[in-house]
């Protein structure tokens, strides 16, 4: 309801989350998820960006997804995240996945770690999805 006031593009937004927040972002990235919650005037996210989540749900109408995790994450196994993205890819959904060597759960922005720069990579993925969405429109 406040997209113009906040200078937000309701057709080009992304959903971001880490750990439990990534579960929420991924679930809300499904095409009709927001409409089911009564937010009918907002289209699907252009991209979902998730960090270290054990969320495994997939559907053919999920949003393009960027994901990253540490190789030593004892809560969100990199293999489980990889399998989820492979299922999304099988639906033709664009994905990008990064495993950062030696990192555990909760590396945040990754400053000073193997994950340094992941935020810029995620933004680039999101921008590519917005560009593709505009091209296809």
Predicted regions and their residues:
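Short alpha-helix in the alpha/beta-hydrolase fold that links the catalytic acid
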Residues: 63, 77-87
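Short, surface-exposed alpha-helical segments at coil->helix boundaries
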Residues: 26, 78-82, 116
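C-terminal catalytic histidine-bearing segment of alpha/beta-hydrolase fold enzymes
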Residues: 68, 89-137
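Glycine-rich, phosphate-binding/catalytic loops in enzymes
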Residues: 31-33, 83-87, 116
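Hydrophobic anchor at the start of a short beta-strand
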Residues: 13, 65, 95
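Primarily recognizes the serine-hydrolase "nucleophile elbow" in alpha/beta-hydrolase
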Residues: 1-62
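Short beta-strand/loop motif that positions the catalytic acidic residue
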Residues: 67-69, 73
């Amino acid at each position: 309801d406040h997209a113009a006031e906040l200078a937000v593009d309701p057709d080009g937004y992304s959903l971001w989350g880490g750990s439990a927040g990534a579960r929420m972002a991924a679930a809300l990235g499904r095409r009709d998820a927001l409409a089911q919650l009564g937010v009918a005037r907002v289209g699907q996210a252009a991209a979902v960006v998730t960090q270290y989540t054990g969320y495994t749900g997939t559907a053919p109408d999920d949003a393009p997804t960027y994901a990253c995790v540490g190789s030593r994450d004892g809560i969100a196994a990199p293999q489980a995240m990889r399998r989820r993205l492979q299922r999304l890819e099988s639906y033709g959904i664009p994905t990008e996945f990064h495993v950062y060597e030696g990192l555990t759960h909760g590396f945040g922005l990754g400053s000073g770690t193997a994950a340094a720069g992941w935020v810029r990579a995620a933004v680039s993925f999101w921008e590519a999805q917005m560009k593709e969405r505009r091209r296809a429109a």
